[in-house]
């Protein structure tokens, strides 16, 4: 029979062995966590400039920068505003667009008036009585 102190020491040794196994398993987890952190740091790292001008499939997908710029067409560069065309260039358009709008409306209105007069004449004309 062992003394109670030795039993406690043996139980402590066995618990230390278990904790060593746990620490080894826990040691494997941080490596994968480190890998995950490394991947995340790569995602949030500013993209490096790539000066490849080819738009083939291989070149569009070879890095994240090229994928965004060439594959998706996203560019964060300052875009230049387009200049307005001069007023003189606008005056050279077709003659129909130069005609004012009210004149066009007047051309259409007499046709409607003729229809109304025909309808009024039919309404006032005496019919064949009953």
Curated annotation (Swiss-Prot):
- Keyword Cytoplasm in record: no
What GO cellular component entries does it have? host cell nucleolus
Could you tell me the keywords of this UniProt record? Answer: Activator, Host nucleus, Host-virus interaction, RNA-binding, Transcription, Transcription regulation
Q: Where in the cell is it found?
A: Host nucleus, Host nucleolus
Region labeled Cysteine-rich — which residues? 50-66
Q: Where is the composition biased (Basic residues)?
A: 79-90
| Quaternary context | Interacts with host CCNT1. Associates with the P-TEFb complex composed at least of Tat, P-TEFb (CDK9 and CCNT1), TAR RNA, RNA Pol II. Interacts with CCNT2; the resulting complex is unable to bind to TAR RNA.
Name this protein carries in UniProt: Protein Tat
- Protein's organism: Simian immunodeficiency virus (isolate Mm142-83) (SIV-mac)
């Amino acid at each position: 029979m062992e003394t109670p102190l030795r039993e406690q020491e043996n139980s402590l040794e066995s618990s230390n062995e278990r904790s060593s196994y746990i620490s080894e398993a826990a040691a494997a987890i941080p490596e994968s966590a480190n890998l995950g952190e490394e991947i995340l740091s790569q995602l949030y790292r500013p993209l490096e400039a790539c000066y490849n001008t080819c738009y083939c499939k291989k070149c569009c997908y070879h890095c994240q920068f090229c994928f965004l710029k060439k594959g998706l067409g996203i560019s964060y560069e300052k875009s230049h505003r387009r200049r307005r065309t001069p007023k003189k260039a606008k005056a050279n358009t077709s003659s129909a667009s130069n005609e004012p709008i009210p004149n066009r409306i007047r051309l259409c209105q007499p046709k409607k008036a003729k229809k109304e007069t025909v309808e009024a004449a039919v309404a006032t004309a005496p019919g064949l009585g009953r």
